[in-house]
Amino acid sequence: EFTDKFPKTPFVPVIGDVRSLGRMDFVFRNYHPQVVFHAAAYKHVPLMESNPCEAVRVNVFGTMNVADHAVKYGVERFVMVSTDKAVNPTNIMGASKRLAEIYVQSLSVAIRDGLQVGTTRFITTRFGNVLGSNGSVIPRFREQIRNGGPVTVTHPDIIRYFMTIPEAAQLVIQAGAMAKGGDVFILDMGEPVKIVDLAKNLVQLSGLSVKDENNSKGDIEITYTGLRPGEKLYEELLIGGDNVRKTSHPRIMTAEEVYLPFEQLSDVLLE
């Protein structure tokens, strides 16, 4: 698909594991990237609740491995794609992503202050759910509607932030271009959406009606399954309410987040 759309752009797909020291060294040594967009992560909240070690291995140590190689091979910019679930996390996935954020920011500050040798600028971008991405609710709801229902929602009051894939990609790239190093960028997600309203709209867009107490002859029923392990009713984008500043881009803000000294953090993680 990429080569069809951009036939003149060289494209080299490389399969690898972000946890593998040897594989990451091979990739950085052979291709010498100028910019790294680090999006590799386990993001499924309930699965990570029952597999915490894997969440830490990939989301934390995988990030460390890629970031360290970026410094080693002189990458100009390293853009980490994070999540709103890293803010005041209540689940393993969110906590692992927050720890990855702290590592990236601490490494960036250590380089800036001359405590670590390197020139790489590290940036973190934090946003919510991406419509149509793997594991998102839209494809699942559509499949449930095609199968005649019911459409399953965890809680009637659960809300989430959403943006489209093109929006997310564009804002991440723009944030990477704006970075000075150590920045945590918050992407404007607009207003949060109630998941049950999203489900109802998808039913109606499919030319069907919702079956409920007000419409017993409707086509598709919506059922509530209960919050899953580690799941919040709502997500946040900021750890503190007053730590955000505007940037030159109307949809990108920067936040001042707490972090640990790099040496202290490295010692803890290596243990």
What are these model-derived regions, one by one?
Residues R29, V71-K72, R146, A177:
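Residue-level signal for alpha-helix termini/capping positions
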Residues V66, S106-E271:
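Strand-loop microenvironment adjacent to phosphate/nucleotide-handling motifs in alpha/beta enzyme folds
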Residues V14-I15, R57, Y224:
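Conserved residues in the N-terminal Rossmann fold of short-chain dehydrogenase/reductase
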Residues F2-K8:
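Short, conserved SAM-binding/catalytic segment
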Residues H32, A40-V45, E49-I102, S106, ...:
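Conserved Rossmann-fold NAD(P)-dependent oxidoreductase catalytic core, especially the SDR/UDP-sugar
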